[in-house]
């Protein structure tokens, strides 16, 4: 009885962790794995945007999120 309860708990917990991992893959891990593709997409999306026109006064100017230090 106790083994079945532990197995059920482990399966539920494992399923939850799998669902969280599946949700985070396209949000976080895919852009890290396909860096050039996302850099090109952002260049297209940001074409024609002047940072000074959209940046609120007093805030740091946004930069390339893929730029590494």
Curated annotation (Swiss-Prot):
A Pfam family reported for this protein in Swiss-Prot or TrEMBL: DUF4538
InterPro entries named in the record: SMIM20
Entry annotated with the keyword Transmembrane: yes
Record field: transmembrane: 9-29
Annotated keywords: Amidation, Membrane, Mitochondrion, Mitochondrion inner membrane, Secreted, Transit peptide, Transmembrane, Transmembrane helix
A single BP term in Gene Ontology: mitochondrial cytochrome c oxidase assembly
GO cellular component, one term: mitochondrial inner membrane
Tissue specificity note: Highly expressed in the hypothalamus, substantia nigra reticulata, Edinger-Westphal nucleus, and nucleus of the solitary tract/dorsal motor nucleus of the vagus, the spinal cord, and sensory ganglia (at protein level). Also expressed in the heart, thymus, esophagus, stomach, spleen, lung, pituitary gland, kidney, jejunum, duodenum, ileum, cerebrum, pons, and colon (at protein level). Expressed in preadipocytes and apidocytes (at protein level). Expressed in pancreatic islet cells (at protein level).
Residues annotated with Phenylalanine amide modification: 66
Residue intervals on the Mitochondrial intermembrane side: 30-69
Subunit record text: Component of the MITRAC (mitochondrial translation regulation assembly intermediate of cytochrome c oxidase complex) complex, the core components of this complex being Coa3/Mitrac12 and Cox14. Interacts with Coa3/Mitrac12 and Cox4i1. Directly interacts with newly synthesized Mt-Co1/Cox1.
PANTHER family associated with the record: SMALL INTEGRAL MEMBRANE PROTEIN 20
Name by which UniProt lists this protein: Small integral membrane protein 20
Organism: Rattus norvegicus (Rat)
Upper taxonomic lineage: Eukaryota, Metazoa, Chordata, Craniata, Vertebrata
Gene name for this UniProt entry: Smim20
């Amino acid at each position: 009885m106790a083994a079945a309860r532990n197995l059920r708990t482990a399966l539920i917990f494992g399923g939850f962790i799998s669902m969280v991992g599946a949700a985070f893959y396209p949000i976080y891990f895919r852009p890290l794995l396909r860096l050039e593709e996302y850099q090109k997409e952002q260049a297209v999306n940001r074409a024609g945007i002047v940072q000074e026109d959209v940046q609120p006064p007093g805030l740091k100017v946004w930069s390339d999120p893929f730029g590494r230090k």
